[in-house]
Design a protein with these regions (language model features):
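Flexible loop/turn segments at secondary-structure boundaries
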Residues: 1, 64-66, 72-74, 130-133, ...
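Glycan-recognition surfaces
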Residues: 1-68
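Conserved, mostly hydrophobic/aromatic
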Residues: 56, 123, 152
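C-terminal beta-sandwich/jelly-roll accessory domains of carbohydrate-active enzymes
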Residues: 129-200
Length: 200
């Protein structure tokens, strides 16, 4: 009912990125991502700027962060992340959302968005508080065309760092990605990946 009168809303004053994973997961059961404002803030500096930004970028991305708080690499990262979000916002804000792994069921979370024509998708994966040497399961994607082939590319990387995602820059069928999945989770705390999939 409220969305008849407002184009977006503030889910919570709590902007701790760990808490936001649970908050945004819950709100997404009812509200579309384009209606949920999510800002990068200074809350929980134990987490990286990358993690905080990747959490906020699964909704309507914003920043409430003093630029003087950021070092050169963090500032460059934020600029690149905003550019990627702007380039992909039609997928994130207007695409079909698939909730893949619930933070309420374990130590990880994953959400993805796909375009209606199934030619582009964005996958988000988050490691929250993994247990030591826990068994990591592949993330099985949804909403792809099983007959199409998709190029997998990890984006939103820190400057001078390389992706260690085994599937990075490789091509898989939609059928494989949905039935077998990709190994995107890690045993790192407060670790995130943003993965772009493009049909070839």
């Amino acid at each position: 009912e409220a969305l008849k009168y407002f184009t977006e809303f503030w889910c919570s004053d709590n902007t701790d990125p760990i808490e936001r994973l649970f908050i945004q997961w819950g709100f997404s059961q009812i509200f579309p991502s384009k209606a949920m404002s999510a800002h990068v803030t200074s809350w929980n500096k134990k987490t990286s700027v990358k993690f905080r930004t990747d959490v906020a970028s699964m909704c309507k991305l914003g920043f409430d962060l003093g630029l003087k708080e950021l070092n050169a690499d963090e500032l460059t990262y934020c600029q690149n992340a905003v550019a990627n979000w702007t380039r992909l916002k039609k997928v994130i804000l207007d695409g079909d959302q698939y909730r893949l792994v619930s933070p309420y069921d374990g130590n990880h979370m994953s959400v993805m968005y796909t375009t209606p024509d199934k030619n582009k998708a964005v996958l988000y994966t988050y490691d929250i508080h993994p247990r030591y040497a826990e068994k990591l399961l592949p993330v099985k994607l949804q909403g792809l065309d099983p007959s199409k082939r998709y190029k997998v590319k990890e984006i939103n990387l820190m400057p001078n760092s390389k992706s260690n995602l085994a599937a990075n820059e490789k091509t898989y069928s939609g059928d494989y990605l949905m039935k077998v999945g990709i190994n995107a989770f890690t045993t790192n705390q407060a670790f995130s990946r943003v993965i772009e999939l493009t049909a070839e």
